[in-house]
């Protein structure tokens, strides 16, 4: 989905050279068509639905995680996620125990411990819990790896450059990093946990299939920190979904890094350094 029905994402890497710029090189492409972000030397945050297949009740395995990917170029290597004890995952239990379609959206949050220390070369982002005002009034960004063969309800997978007609429907470059030309807005906080922290918020960062699991991040004291995870679009996903329109200001949703989820990240970083 795209806010105001205009896709303003731009290519964030060369077509042939890996994404070397900081902090974009910390953002991972998943070969199972998701995104994630390194928040430790071998620790990444993503969406629960990128890690756990609810209909089959199985963890996803066999896919590759590639930081800073640009097509067939991966300057920082990649890590294959095997089955067995070499990989550690986390999703809230409520996500895995819910209906076949997956748990409520507020539980769509996942942590992945990679078998390889990719972050030693790329570095990694921080992670933080911001207040509602901190998210609403701050500069929030999203970068991810769109699945170029996936289309919206109008049969279009749009990636528009800044100067292009917003309805031109340009074809994107597969397995490359994209993001809005500027920061995006956030609001509509909902699904409070037991401590009163809203676990979901809506946002205007343009995204499509493949962006799932990508970080919503902000700069705190000059350093990038993950403050949420993009999980879904609220319009325009399928032919039966409501269409995105020019009045769709924040048509996408993210799971927030609450104090509870932040504690889980710290736990896995300490337990599996």
Where are these regions (language model features)?
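Catalytic histidine site
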Residues: 22-64, 68-69, 218, 232
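Chymotrypsin/trypsin-fold serine protease catalytic domain
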Residues: 105-207
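Protease-domain processing segments flanking chymotrypsin-fold serine proteases, especially trypsin-like
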Residues: 1-40, 259-273
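Conserved catalytic-core segment of clan PA serine endopeptidases
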Residues: 2-25, 52, 58-120
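C-terminal cap/linker of serine protease catalytic domains
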Residues: 231-273
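Acidic glycine-/aspartate-rich tracts in secreted/extracellular proteins
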Residues: 50-52, 69-73, 116-119, 146-148, ...
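Catalytic nucleophile loop of clan PA
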Residues: 37-38, 206-230
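Extracellular/periplasmic catalytic domains that process cell-envelope and extracellular macromolecules
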Residues: 19-23, 38-39, 56-59, 89, ...
């Amino acid at each position: 989905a795209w806010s105001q029905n205009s896709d303003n994402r731009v290519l964030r890497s060369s077509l042939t050279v890996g994404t070397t710029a900081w902090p974009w090189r910390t953002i991972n492409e998943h070969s199972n068509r998701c995104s994630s972000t390194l928040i430790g030397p071998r620790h990444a945050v993503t969406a629960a639905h990128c890690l756990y297949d609810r209909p089959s009740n199985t963890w996803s395995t066999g896919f590759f995680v590639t930081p800073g990917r640009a097509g067939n170029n991966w300057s920082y290597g990649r890590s294959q996620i095997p089955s067995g004890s070499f990989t550690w995952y986390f999703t809230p239990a409520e996500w895995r125990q819910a209906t076949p379609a997956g748990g409520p959206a507020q539980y769509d949050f996942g942590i992945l411990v990679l078998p390889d220390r990719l972050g030693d070369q790329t570095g990694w982002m921080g992670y933080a819990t911001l207040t509602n005002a901190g998210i609403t009034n701050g500069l929030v960004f999203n970068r991810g790896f769109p699945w170029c063969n996936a289309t919206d309800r109008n049969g279009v997978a749009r990636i528009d450059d800044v100067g292009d007609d917003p309805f031109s429907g340009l074809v994107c470059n597969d397995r490359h990093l994209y993001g809005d030309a500027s920061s995006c807005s956030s609001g509509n906080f909902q699904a409070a946990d037991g401590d009163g922290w809203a676990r979901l918020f809506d946002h205007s960062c343009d995204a499509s299939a493949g962006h799932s699991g990508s970080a919503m991040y902000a700069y705190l004291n000059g350093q990038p920190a993950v403050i949420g995870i993009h999980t879904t679009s609220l319009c325009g996903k399928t032919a039966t979904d409501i269409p995105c329109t020019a009045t769709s200001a924040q048509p996408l949703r993210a799971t927030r890094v609450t104090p509870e989820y932040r504690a889980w990240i710290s736990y896995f970083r300490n337990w599996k350094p």
